[in-house]
A protein has these predicted regions:
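Acidic-leaning, charged glycine-interspersed low-complexity segments
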Residues: 22-23, 32-43, 88-143
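Oligomerization/assembly interface segments of phage tail-like spikes and tubes
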Residues: 56-73, 133-146
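Short, charged, solvent-exposed linker or helix-capping segments at domain edges/interfaces
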Residues: 74-78, 149-154
Length: 154
């Protein structure tokens, strides 16, 4: 298995082991349609770029998106702080999901040979229209060894 496939498989496995995640995809975007078979919360994994910082390392930029569908309560309420939906719950739960995935990659570098960068960038995301969803996008770099290259073969 090449290092790119190993990286995606590692992230997929970590996400699937999270009890809060029901579906893991590699679409490069969240394509939501509640009439499809995807169960939420969903994690989408994609590589947005790569560099070669040295002859022995490949640095890949990873973006993970975790979202859940928003449920709306139609009860009339006078509370202006809390919306009549589960947006806050979705944001809290999906934030913890992306945090757990990133922490596992960050801490288990000796086992996986994948080194996740410190201080990932996080952005809350919200979908409107037919399917309303809430969640987080996290972007971070990972360094992986360029194992297919050898200085002896140059």
């Amino acid at each position: 298995m090449n290092i790119y496939s190993k990286l995606l498989q590692t992230i997929k496995t970590i996400a699937e082991q999270d009890s809060s995640v029901n579906t893991v995809t590699n679409n490069g975007r969240i394509d939501l349609d509640i009439n499809k078979t995807d169960l939420f919360p969903i994690v989408d994994v994609f590589v947005t770029g790569a560099t070669f910082p040295s002859d022995a390392v490949i640095r890949l930029t990873i973006e993970l998106v975790c979202v859940d569908l928003r449920d709306t309560n139609n009860e009339v309420t006078s509370d202006k702080f809390w919306n009549q939906d589960n947006e806050v719950d979705n944001l809290g739960e999906t934030l913890m999901v992306v945090n757990r995935i990133w922490k596992k990659l960050y801490k288990d570098f000796e086992d996986t040979n994948i080194t996740a960068s410190e201080s990932p960038a996080l952005v809350p995301i919200e979908g409107d229209g037919k399917d309303v969803y809430d969640g987080w996008s996290i972007t971070f770099d990972v360094d992986v060894p360029s194992v297919e290259m050898s200085l002896c073969n140059d």
